[in-house]
Regions:
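Surface-exposed cap/loop segments at beta↔alpha junctions
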Residues: 43-135
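Short beta-strand-centered interaction patches in the first periplasmic/extracellular domains
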Residues: 69-91, 130-221
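Amphipathic, non-transmembrane alpha-helical segments in extracytoplasmic/periplasmic proteins
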Residues: 27, 35-36, 84, 99-132, ...
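Acidic, small/polar-enriched beta strand-loop surface segments
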Residues: 160, 190-290, 294, 301-340
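N-terminal "assembly arms/tails" that initiate or stabilize quaternary assembly
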Residues: 12-53
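Solvent-exposed edge beta-strands and adjacent loop segments
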Residues: 1-29, 203-215
Length: 353
């Protein structure tokens, strides 16, 4: 499996096809990462440098080299370990500058964030000249709404959180014109819960799951939150989000004192402010749902092929030998290549509704 090395001018300077192991991870709504393990060769250091890029044919994501480590070991031999993250990590380099309220269409809101922080910011030094926004026409994206207030939040954390809340993905791909093209996208439903697309099923019955791990937990589940906003003591403004009673009620406190009714555009009405508190509460509850995950090494050369029959973010049908079955989306995919061969490990997550 070959890797292409690009310098900071996006010029191809080397092809890597000799290494002891490589782990390359793509993710649906967060940045991916990689690790490559080499037998030490000083020539590698000529083109494996921090801030250079790695491109893999089997992935649409491009990685940034961030860490280079040399291990000297008289018994095991000397090794070079190169690690880094995908282009999505660029968003960590910016914050929401000052106080901002985003209300209305979600995609438009994210585009505004990117315009103000990266594409056409008022502070020229914040601009990344080759960064562009590619709007989606998918109704799964265009119908989504936002009603949030931010002050100094990390841009990456904001976009990641919004995508996770709405079960959508985001990506930054390197185009043929050497642009960093940002876009939102939604996976295709290929489960038994729809009839428009061919089914993709991973199950022992189809002999396409080599091994699997199933995990389910309600330990951190919460369904009611008291959201406390601005003010002090008994005068602090609060909202209750969620409902349940008795033993089924699981409460959570949400500190929302960072949400202010006084904004750069004027004072929020009571209704507008309470809507902001409720949004904050819903986000906190979304971080405390029942956790269900299914990890497995799958056979991807015969029945269903990654990159042809299914992609990151797609909703597929999964089952294991113990009767755990349902639909879930592919949240990440690990490509592992070593002397033992090529393996692909997807992680499936249930959809929060």
């Amino acid at each position: 499996m070959e890797l292409l090395v690009l310098n900071t001018d996006f010029e191809s300077i080397a092809v890597i096809d000799t290494y002891e192991s490589m782990i390359w991870t793509d993710r649906y709504n967060s940045y991916g990462d990689f690790e490559i393990f080499f037998a030490m060769d000083t020539q590698l250091l000529q083109y494996l440098k921090e801030d250079y890029y790695l491109w893999l044919k089997d992935s649409e994501h491009c990685m940034i080299i961030e860490d280079i480590k040399i291990n000297a070991d008289t018994e095991e031999g000397n090794h070079l370990i190169v690690t880094g993250r995908s282009l999505e990590s660029i968003l960590e380099r910016r914050i929401i500058w000052g106080q901002r309220i985003f209300n209305g269409n979600l995609q438009n809101g994210i585009q505004t964030m990117l315009n103000e922080c990266i594409i056409s910011p008022s502070i020229a030094d914040r601009k990344i000249s080759n960064f562009v926004f590619v709007p989606s026409t998918d109704p799964k994206i265009t119908r989504l709404k936002i009603d949030n207030q931010y002050t100094g939040d990390c841009l990456y954390d904001v976009i990641k959180g919004l995508c996770e809340e709405n079960n959508i993905g985001f990506k930054i791909v390197l185009t043929d014109e050497n642009e960093f093209a940002f876009s939102l996208y939604a996976g295709v439903d290929r489960s038994y819960e729809q009839t428009e697309n061919p089914y993709v099923v991973f199950s022992p019955n189809f002999e396409n799951i080599i091994n699997s791990n199933y995990y389910s937990s309600r330990a951190s589940f919460r369904n009611v939150t008291l959201v406390a906003g601005e003010g002090e003591g008994a005068a602090r403004r609060t909202a209750i989000v969620g409902s349940a009673s008795g033993l089924d009620r699981r409460e959570l406190f949400t500190d929302a004192r960072d949400i202010s009714s006084d904004t750069e555009d004027g004072t929020l009405s009571d209704a507008e402010y309470m809507a902001q508190l409720r949004t904050k509460g819903l986000k906190n509850l979304a971080d405390h749902i029942v956790t269900t995950a299914f990890e497995g090494e799958v056979e991807v050369t015969r029945l269903f092929k990654y990159g042809e029959d299914f992609f990151i973010g797609d909703i597929v049908q999964i089952a294991n030998e113990y009767g755990n079955e349902g639909s879930a989306y592919i949240s990440e995919l690990v490509i592992s290549n070593s002397e033992e061969g090529l393996s692909i490990y997807p992680t499936f997550k249930t959809i929060s509704k």
